[in-house]
Amino acid sequence: MLKKDFWYDLPKELIAQEPADPRDAARLMVLDRKNDKILHSVFHELPHYLEKGDLLVVNNSKVLPARLMGTKVPTGAVCELLLLRQVKGDTWECLARPGKRMQAGTKVEFGDGSLTAVVDETLPDGNKYVTFSYDTETLYEKLDEFGKMPLPPYITKQLEDQSQYQTVYAKELGSAAAPTAGLHFTPQLMDTIRSRGVKIAEVTLHVGLGTFRPVNEESIEDHQMHSEWYSVSEETANLINETRAAGHRVIAVGTTSCRTLESVWAKYGKIVPCSGNTSIFIYPGIELKAIDGLITNFHLPESTLIMLISAFYGYDKTMAAYKVAVEEKYRFFSFSDAMFIR
């Protein structure tokens, strides 16, 4: 298939600049595969569309406040580092701006100078290996003090509270972007879901900035996905296998949870406790075998995410549903309304 097959026209005003308040006040489009119907609801009504015995699988990755504004030593020139992944110890792979002026040996100070960094080397793609020094026990304490959330480029409004870009169940630090389908859940909603006999399991997939990288190839099969680290615990693997054995549904919350489970299934032919890196790319023609339902947001035109949705729900039905979403003025992208394919 071609990239242009996944294009749709989206009015700019439908790109959400802030999350719903409260979180579960977001709208919910329910795509009923059995009856081939589109239903319009609100996210706090999600429990009504779940069944006793269902299992929701959420991604518990936590977003790092990984965007650091600093000054070069001794010139005082303003610069920016965006932490992408931990290489080893206090050395991280970073995106640097202005990259050409931050060569090996460049020293940077942040805040009151209690956090510093030295550029070690420049990688072939222009990213940098950077080693940090600080006066606290961990770097994460300094990131909480000086760092900002690395919001997607299409969100131009500053957040009032950085927790707005974290799920309420986030615990494993490591993502450069939020697993956004989970932003709709509140603790109260999760309690209601559990009270209906629905279980909730956790996986971890640390979302990389590659999630925003556009597909540049005309033929989507030629696209090379970025690599991301994931982990599935023994407890989660057991819950998934017990749910399937009992004939109940495994429902992925978000494309990251979906990609985690499908990666494990593709490698082992079943769900097992494991961790590793995945660059799985799911698009029409690839059968999803690990999930029975998917809760997700409304994604960018021509993105790998809308291609994944098309693989699960069907290309024609997906594009038709997106057309309806635009007509009904649903909100799109990271702070968007939600879709439940059941």
What are these regions (language model features)?
Residues M1-R342:
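Surface-exposed, charge/polar-rich loops and edge strands
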